[in-house]
Amino acid sequence: MESGRRHPREEIVATMRRIYHYRMTTTSGGNLSIRDPDGTIWITPARVDKGALEPADVVCLEAAGARRGRHAPSSEYPFHRAIYQARPDLGAVVHAHPGALVAFSICRRLPETRVQVLAHAICGKVVYAPYACPGSEQLGRNIAGAFGAGADCVMLENHGVVIGGKDLPDAFQRFETLEFVAQTLVKAATLGEVRVLPAERLVERELPAPGELPPVPPTGRETELREQICRFVHRAYEQRLLISTAGSLSARLDGEQFLITPRRRDRLELEPPGVVRATAAACERGKRPSRTARLHAAIYRNDPSAGAVINAQPAHTSAFAVTPAVLSTRTIPESYVVLREVGKLPHACVVAEAERIAAEVSLARRPVLLIENEGALVVGRDVLDAFDRLEVLEATAEALVLSQPLGPLVPMPSAAIDELRRVFGVP
């Protein structure tokens, strides 16, 4: 969601539909608001189906006190108002009851964002607000106090979560990222001790400013690749393999050039013109490639057979990345044939240590690699091949997590693995 593209009513409806569609709230739960520069607050209504919200349902509360709209505002308007009073820098608030964050809420635990560099950078300070009755002035004071102390994410005891942002896309992306971290941690809890990154590893490294590639008319192949990248990025988002803030996909174009997703742009709203043409050191004017651009460039340079590369942090796969657990592919034939053996690399920065990471993967030898506390790196012959590999990886990880309460894994025997290698030509 890009800020400023829609009227506040439409932006609130689009965001709530997205939250509801991905089961991050219920028909009756959660509320969103936007504050205009003049102090006007737009907020979701009380007692209206979140799954069927329309722009006309959104309530407008003017700074002078007038109310416009056909419904009463959300019963939790008091805490939205209190947050804005405590934090003049905030332009939007998201409140919802997503499953994993509610699990932390009812256990009175904070989701540990130090398991991933990007999540830690996006979510900022996460704190608790003491319980109070929903809709009460006391709850508003409790939440506003937490925001006033500098938090961007406030967990509510036995309730849910409240997230603030400079605008609604910013707040939503922070919310979605925190819920994905919580999902990862819940799944990781079944696998072993969660590994937290030390402070020196949590610094988000920046790429040097890239040079500019000369403008050239796109070829037919480039046009097709841009469209294909967008289709598979949207599909990966729908499959929850990527989220709005995390994950990158690239495809080799020609020579040293490749096309890659942009940095800090909502993955679900990516369109072909937003895809970035890049090399290891340059890109199209006025665009910012993903922070993984240097890594992808190194992989293409090292491996002429690689046609597409994906970095992703899907929840089940990430659970293996943040614990010592081994992601075994000797589960079913599809997993072994598509993924082969999945190695795990000690934590490495995809920006500063791109060359080190790139040396560990190749299409023929090791097309899938886990990077501790970073996620998955997948190489394919083309975009479809890489996407399929990522999808199978997450499905395999999910099956392994789901098997934990049932008993120890019974892997395919060596004879079966040898047969798969012979029949399917697995190196």
Residue ranges and their predicted role:
Residues 1-427:
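Glycine-rich flexible loops
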